[in-house]
Amino acid sequence: MKRFTVNKSLVINGKDAISFVDSLISNSLKDGMPKFSYLLSPDGKVNSWFIVYQAGSEIFIFQDNDKLIQIKEFLLKYKFRTDCNLDLIDVQYSFAI
């Protein structure tokens, strides 16, 4: 088993956050359950993989710092008429994978 340690997370919150993210990733969100997922392009191709975690009305995406910036930019392309915020935050978290 390996450890995956991150020091940043992309946090998504707001009224439409869950439906917005759920429509763009490969696995359905489930509150309190971290899981691997993929960000899919409109044609269904894998754009990025990451760990996603839903905590109530907030969603946290964990990946390397450079990838988080790319994921945020990708999500912002599809965030029109959607009430949610996307912010990079500092965290200290480690996953056993």
Enumerate the language-model features and the residues they cover:
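Basic, glycine/lysine-rich polyanion-binding surfaces/domains
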Residues: 1-97
